[in-house]
Amino acid sequence: TRLENDFGSRVQFVGLSSNSLITHPQDGPAQLAEQAQRHGWAFPYLLDDQQVLAKSLQAACTPEIYLFSHDSKGSSPTLQYRGQLDSSRPGNDQPLDGSDLRAALNAVLIGTSVSQNQVASVGCNVKWNPGQEPEWFG
């Protein structure tokens, strides 16, 4: 929410849940809406129940951060950043501050290159629909 407050007038944030509703019905629309309300998220929080977007992005875990940009001519979005929110992990005493994403956002907004030193996200794996696991998974 801090990132949304700091960048929301210049950036569109979107949340996406791609977990299987077959194996994880607790990740359904009502629960997502409750989660968004509990955390004060004002951005759209979408359900990818067919896992189409997750597969096209080659998502592996949750949370996984993607930052896209586009030029003023309306070109197709360009992936600028894929990685962790920050270095915080349960029990490591690192602050949950969004520093990695914040640095990438600042770079895109001022028109400089985003660092290629992008640390992969760590989290629970995407819960794929049975029999639909992508080839990179497992």
Predicted regions and their residues:
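Active-site donor-binding loop signature of nucleotide-sugar glycosyltransferases
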Residues: S18, H70, L85-S87
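Structural microenvironment flanking redox-active thiols in thiol-disulfide oxidoreductases
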Residues: T1-R38, V52-A54
